[in-house]
Amino acid sequence: MLEFHHMFHSYNDNPSVSDVSFSVSEGEVVTLLGPSGCGKTTLLRLAAGLERPREGEIWLDGKLVSDAGMVVAPETRGIGFMFQDYALFPNKTVRQNIAFGKGAGDHRERVEQLIAMAGIRGLEQRFPHEISGGQQQRVALVRALATQPTLLLLDEPLSHLDPELKESVRNELQKLFRETNTTALFVSHDIEDAMAMADRMVVMRDGKAEQIGTTDEVYDQPANRHVARLFGKTNFIPAGLLAEAENSFEGENGEGRVVQVWPHQWRIVEQTDGDSPVFTGKIKSVTNRGAHREVTLETEQLTLTIHLTGNVALKAGDSLSVSGDLSA
């Protein structure tokens, strides 16, 4: 459906995208994930035809639409857009906003289906300021999907929503994508959005793709420390201390290969626990995080972050032995 081949782009001789290649299959939702300035929005603009690549090619539905010498105009690509601020016209009603999309008037039956599926029936005659942020978001999505675009591009579609509303709208978006078999590429810096909505993710850093894979692959087998840290606090253990670990990656500053162990993958054990490597040390701190206790354990080899659930009667200064359960 959408293919990037060795994309390079720069602004004022400053590289913004460096040798990025990936594809989005029909009916697939892919997220470009990373911090501000990593190149993800540039890739979205390249896909839209709003920028021309310095090198590389973009193919859409089997046709070359961009390379260093040409760019097919955005309005002829059959692409739908959903902007960060939704870009609704304040002086138009919900129905008028939806109908404003090019060719939307030719898809009345689809528009009615989308209105029902998105749960905005009854809001058609209201103006944007008369509906909630979540409802505005759904109106913008219906407008983007009304013309049956080949591809939907979304730029941080959930960034303006409060946490409670965000989760609800995220679930609705995911459901609507599946029901309409939407092919989508969306930009996000939020790992929860990416994990919940995407089939695959492209993790970006400094203009390069650090890792491309399914959400499970990226979570279970991060390519490096940067990717692993996207998911929150974690532990990096020298591979030699966890000989049974199957997945490791090259560490930083010449430290050799390391294994990532999530805080929840530790279990309390006796100092001798068969063949499993045991780490023993003194507890530096215990913090109540609500659903779990976060324990900082200083061992002879390294400092560990451990999440324990249940009735944890531990305090700073206590001795503790733990073993990593990488299957947890």
Map each language-model feature to its residues.
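ABC ATPase nucleotide-binding domain helices that frame the ATP-binding cleft
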Residues: 41-44, 139
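ABC ATPase NBD Q-loop/coupling interface
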Residues: 57-77
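The feature captures the beta-strand-to-loop junction immediately N-terminal to the Walker
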Residues: 33-35
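Non-catalytic connector elements of ABC transporters
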Residues: 234, 245-328
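ABC ATPase nucleotide-binding domains
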Residues: 74, 78-80, 84, 88-226
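Conserved coupling/switch loops of ABC nucleotide-binding domains, chiefly the family-specific signature
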Residues: 54-57, 206
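Helix-to-loop junction immediately C-terminal to a conserved catalytic motif
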Residues: 48
